[in-house]
């Protein structure tokens, strides 16, 4: 099997990659939402992967990952890899998770990556209040990303610990 084409469409604001093969199997991958500017970066790799075997995912990726693995190029490379794994799974008649080592758990906790609450300030207590609101949300699993670093100068807040699960999965 050989790759015959790579195309990118912007659907909404998301770059969607389609890789086609000479055997009629297509693979689809998605880049980060709200980043339509990734389209030319994804297309940059087209000629580098044409003619390659898409089921040799790691070999194809070694050839392009060196060309750019940091943002925003890394997002472009990841979308291509996603499409390659899609082809490999379809070709083998297996879901991709089986190709990646198999099922580890029956349930996966949802990460709250988009529900945000307005902050009243930038003090540690404000972050703790914001995190409590996120904890009380039905998804109850989130991460503070707003300029808080493990190595930053933010003081500890009583009862708030980095890396401690808010609630274990049932």
Predicted regions and their residues:
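Short, Gly/Pro- and small/polar-rich lid/capping loops
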Residues: 1-18
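Short loop/turn motifs at secondary-structure junctions
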Residues: 2, 43, 138-140
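Cofactor-binding beta-sheet edge motifs in enzyme active sites
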Residues: 3-5, 29, 109
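Metal-dependent enolase-superfamily TIM-barrel catalytic cores that perform enediolate-based chemistry
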Residues: 107, 112-170
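Glycine-rich, aromatic-flanked loop segments that form ligand/cofactor-binding clefts
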Residues: 81-118, 137
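Residues that line or immediately flank small-molecule/substrate-binding pockets and catalytic motifs
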Residues: 10, 33, 148
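Metal- or metallocofactor-binding catalytic centers and their adjacent structured scaffolds
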Residues: 20-94
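Flexible, glycine/charged-enriched surface loops at secondary-structure junctions
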Residues: 57, 96, 141-143
